[in-house]
């Protein structure tokens, strides 16, 4: 759960002075995390003799991770870096010694004791075994409860193989100190120098002052002697060792580009032949292309324009699907497939085509849109039609594993729906015929129309995307126990957008329409404003259900509104309702 909560995708448009109406920079950021209650983010304004900054941070971290210090503003998106490697180790026991093989020699496995203090119980001490690659995971996997969609087999320590993890944090880390120095930066150079110390979190950081903008990829990227680290490597040969880390100067970066704007949205930000291997987990380009489309269209942006962009629901993916349905060769192939359908099925497929045609559906995934509801249903139906015959029904491990994988960067449905015409998955193995893409697409149109009728009623004029697709904030206690739902949970509320819109509202294609990923915070620093920092977190600032601040950000989120966060002491005193003063 923690992986999903902290490492999803994000969007970062930033504007150079020449792109804004007021002539000074605008820095924007929204981080897309799991829809969670309490919120993973908190808004914090932190002042002490050596530090003055406001923005967002994670509870318990005493520095601002994205924000504004009066001179420099910064935000971040995830790179999804390939920064960890698993090594298969040959291990054996001799008497009381645990050994591992490396380059023909049996070496001693290092052992240390870790003690965990547990409230109300005695401390628990466990041994941790490590090779030079990192800790052996055998014992951890042996006692780790695995969900059915991730059927990883435990590895007992007494088998002849171990699994070790290489990761830079095993040797210590200074990332928190780097964020502290970033919050104190008073120039672009000082900001980039601070960013160079962010080693263990792999980010696209955008930063700027009133007259400059910049982008910098962070983190220590291992230089591998062989391989890319995508699969566990033999640890005993020495062929796959790490040979240091890429220098900071080799990481992608930019300052004041000719385009006068920068954008990152977890998409591929470097060419395929870029000499540095950052990741194999780029997200699709649709959100970034939409941001680029908007940013390249004018040179007088205001903060209101940026707010509208962060709340934008136009889907480039829906437009691509629309092009396939209606244009040229693909449209003809689809109609040929529809001609062979049962008359009743063809009738629904034709109705779906009429609703999704360019004159009827503008590719904006608004809450009140019938076309958006049908497009969302089409994504859902196509996923099931293409993959369920091979992977099994909802209760199969294969299907659950596929659904889990589809929540990460690569989308097999995107690939089959838009980017290829040739795949064995198009054939429905439960029929004697050999189906192609357009047979499955025609079937999916019929199934999507039928799904909307069942869920939204027979009158398509009454269909609304927000009736199918909803935000529902559910507290972990209520989800796990079923208790206090009315007290702890909030929603459901109608949701627009989808996983491919700038205003992300991700749902799992093929499973259901429940929104699970949202912009957990939105931030804009407009250097043209007297109080530049505007921000919200979702759904709240307080984790106490009886607090008025438990859910008071939800209306702001739904309506696309922001809170102004002043940095000046007099303005701050008027703005805040509660102040905590810590004295030595």
Positions of predicted regions on the chain:
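Contiguous transmembrane helix-bundle modules in multi-pass membrane proteins
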Residues: 340-341, 345-352, 357, 361-388
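Long, compositionally biased intrinsically disordered regions
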Residues: 432-435, 443-472, 476-482, 500, ...
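A general marker of short, structured functional hotspots
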Residues: 96, 375, 383, 398, ...
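Mature extracytoplasmic enzyme cores
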Residues: 1, 6-346, 358, 364, ...
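Polar/charged alpha-helical tracts
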Residues: 89, 323, 332, 336-354, ...
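Charged, long alpha-helical assembly modules
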Residues: 371-462
């Amino acid at each position: 759960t923690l992986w999903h909560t902290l490492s999803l995708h994000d969007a970062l448009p930033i504007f150079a002075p020449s792109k804004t109406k007021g002539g000074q920079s605008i820095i924007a950021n929204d981080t897309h995390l799991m829809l969670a209650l309490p919120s993973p983010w908190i808004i914090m304004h932190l002042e002490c003799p050596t530090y003055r900054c406001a923005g967002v941070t994670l509870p318990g971290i005493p520095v601002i991770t994205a924000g504004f210090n009066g001179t420099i503003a910064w935000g971040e998106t995830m790179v999804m870096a390939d920064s960890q490697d698993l090594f298969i180790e040959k291990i054996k026991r001799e008497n009381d010694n645990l050994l591992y093989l490396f380059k023909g020699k049996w070496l001693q496995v290092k052992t240390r004791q870790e003690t965990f203090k547990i409230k109300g119980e005695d401390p628990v001490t466990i041994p941790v075994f490590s090779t030079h690659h990192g800790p052996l995971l055998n014992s951890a996997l042996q006692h780790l409860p695995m969900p059915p969609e991730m059927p990883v087999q435990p590895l007992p320590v007494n088998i002849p193989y171990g699994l070790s993890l290489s990761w830079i944090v095993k040797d210590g880390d200074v990332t928190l100190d780097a964020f502290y120095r970033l919050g104190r930066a008073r120039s672009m150079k000082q900001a980039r120098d601070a960013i160079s110390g962010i080693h263990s979190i792999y980010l696209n950081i955008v930063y700027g002052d009133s007259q400059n903008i910049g982008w910098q990829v962070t983190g220590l990227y291992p230089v591998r002697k062989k391989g890319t680290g995508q699969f566990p490597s033999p640890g005993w040969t020495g062929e796959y060792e790490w040979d240091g880390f890429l220098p900071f100067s080799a990481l992608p970066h930019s300052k004041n580009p000719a385009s006068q704007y920068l954008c990152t949205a977890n998409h591929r930000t470097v060419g395929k032949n870029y000499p540095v291997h950052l990741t194999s987990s780029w997200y699709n380009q649709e959100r970034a292309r939409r941001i680029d489309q908007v940013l390249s269209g004018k040179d007088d942006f205001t903060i209101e324009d940026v707010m509208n962009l962060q709340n934008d629901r136009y889907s480039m993916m829906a437009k691509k699907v629309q092009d396939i349905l209606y244009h040229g060769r693909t449209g003809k192939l689809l109609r040929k497939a529809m001609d062979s359908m049962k008359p009743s099925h063809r009738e629904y497929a034709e109705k779906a085509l009429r609703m999704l045609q360019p004159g009827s559906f503008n590719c904006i995934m608004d809450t009140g849109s019938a076309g958006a509801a049908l497009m969302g249903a089409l994504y859902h139906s196509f996923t099931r039609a293409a993959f369920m015959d091979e992977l099994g029904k909802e209760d199969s491990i294969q299907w659950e594993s596929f659904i889990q994988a589809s929540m990460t960067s690569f989308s097999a449905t995107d690939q089959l729906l838009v980017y290829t015409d040739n795949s064995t998955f198009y054939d429905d193995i439960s029929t004697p015929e050999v189906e192609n893409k357009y047979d499955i697409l025609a079937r999916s149109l019929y199934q999507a129309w039928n799904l909307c009728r069942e869920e939204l009623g027979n009158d398509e004029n009454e269909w609304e995307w927000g009736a199918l697709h909803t935000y529902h904030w559910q507290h972990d206690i209520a989800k796990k126990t079923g208790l206090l739902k009315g007290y702890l949970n909030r929603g459901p509320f109608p949701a627009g957008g989808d996983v491919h819109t700038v205003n992300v509202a991700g749902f799992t294609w093929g499973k259901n329409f429940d929104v699970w990923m949202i912009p957990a915070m939105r931030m804009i620093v407009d250097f043209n404003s007297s109080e530049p920092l505007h921000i919200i977190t979702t759904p709240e600032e307080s984790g106490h259900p009886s607090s008025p601040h438990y859910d008071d950000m939800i209306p702001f989120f739904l309506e696309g509104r922001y809170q102004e966060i002043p940095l000046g002491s007099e303005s701050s005193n008027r703005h805040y309702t509660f102040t905590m003063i810590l004295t030595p």
